[in-house]
Structure formats: structure tokens, C-alpha cells
Amino acid sequence: MDNHSAGFGKTLLRIRKNKQYSQQYMAENKIHQSTYSKMERDLIEPTLGNYRHLLSRLDMSDEELQYIMNDYNHSEKEQLLTAFMNLSFNDVPLLQEIREKALKYLDVHTDYIITDIVHLTDALIILAITGDIADARKHVRPVWKRLEKLDGWYLVELRMINAMLFLFPIDEAILISGTALAQIQKYVNHPFAGKIAVSLRHNLCLLL
């Protein structure tokens, strides 16, 4: 699995020992003993099926394991996304800082969401400094142009839509939020989705 670092095996070994689980317990007759041993020594990476099995045996989510593997921190991308979603949208210095970090990230990676963040920080900086919402909306349009073509929205897209909803004209914001709330219904049992839904409704009420 290419998305996991070379330290997966060492992390797996450390967690297993901390939990006082045996290799036999982890493998549970689903993974050959020799295969499991090679994974802990970072000689091979797990298949997707084995990876999911190991997460289940560790009683962990993928997010928690990745957090541990990254020295108990979020990835660079997740840090950018979290910083953007949590900031005060009139904090120009912080907006500029996030924008610069996003541009540096894009020097190394091709990433649609981080590109969206650059556009949105541009829009928010303009709005905070000049109050010109028409000019700010020009920077939002490329983001919406990409998102509206998608066959479905997932949590990260829904978070982006929520972040920029107040920049749309009211009639468009009503339509977009309605579509977004319908998409969120698919996540009815997901704890984070409820927060997005509440925030979407709150932001829409502020526009009305």
C-alpha cells in the first residue's frame, strides 16, 4: 500500500507490544505467520484486506494509526486543512500564512483540495481587506466550478462547500446548501457529518 510509510511495520510492532497482543492474536488465522512477521519487519507492506484486518485487531481507525505513524501528529495536508477550517475568516495574517504553506505544499504535490484552499484564502483576504465581495467571488468560482461537476460530494468536499457558502449569492447558497445537506444524509451515522450539517444550516441562516 503506497500510502503508508516505511515505518508501518515498526509502528505495528510497537502498538502490538504495548497492547500485549501476540502475533497469533493479530493474525487470527487470516494472515500467514511468516507474512505477518515480514510486515512487522517492514519487509513487505500489507494488502488492503490485511491492513483492514490489522486495524480491526488493533481496535484502531486508519486515522489514528496514521496519526501515530506521523509521530503523533497530523500529516502536512491534514494540518493545512484543519488550520483553514478552524481559522477566523477575517484573520488576514493567518490567512496569508496558510496560503503560503499551501503554495509550498503544491510545489511538491498536485492536490485539488489544497489548490482550492489557495483560491479560498485569496477570496477571504480580499474580502477582509477591501470588503469587495464581487472581487472575492471571482476566486471562489474555480473551486465551485470543480465541485459542481463531481458525481458526489464526500466529507472533505462538504467541508469546503461549508467554508465558502457565505460567499455565494443567497439564491445560489440556498440551492448549494440543499444539495450538500442531501449528500450529508448518506453519513447519518458518522459523528463528524452532523457537525457539518449544523454548520451549513447556521451559515445559511446568517445569509437569510
Task: Give names to the regions the model predicted.
Residues 19-38:
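Short alpha-helical DNA-recognition segment
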Residues 108-208:
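Conserved binding/catalytic microenvironments
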Residues 49-64:
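DNA major-groove recognition helix of helix-turn-helix/homeodomain DNA-binding modules
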Residues 67-94:
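Short, charged recognition helix plus adjacent turn
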Residues 11, 22, 47-50:
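Residues that mark the N-terminal boundary/hinge immediately upstream of a DNA-recognition element
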